[in-house]
Amino acid sequence: MKRTFQPHNRKRRNKHGFRQRMATKTGRKIISSRRAKGRHSLSVSSDMGSRRQ
């Protein structure tokens, strides 16, 4: 049987990336709360940027 999680980096970035978070009010709240907590990575795309060419 096929598993439900089929990972793809593009889909991951598009759904949970920084630009996607900033597009909604609740997304901005998530980013600000992660900043306040002192998270090393704010979103998926923010730590993918260095690896992507």
From Swiss-Prot:
Keyword DNA-binding part of the UniProt annotation: no
InterPro entries on file: Ribosomal_bL34 (IPR000271), Ribosomal_bL34_CS (IPR020939)
GO annotation terms (biological process): translation
Region called Disordered, residue ranges: 1-53
Keywords: Ribonucleoprotein, Ribosomal protein
Pfam families associated with the record: Ribosomal_L34 (PF00468)
GO molecular function: structural constituent of ribosome
Compositionally skewed regions (Basic residues) per UniProt: 1-19, 26-40
Family membership: Belongs to the bacterial ribosomal protein bL34 family.
HAMAP family, A to Z: Ribosomal_bL34
Descriptive protein name: Large ribosomal subunit protein bL34
Organism: Chlorobium phaeobacteroides (strain BS1)
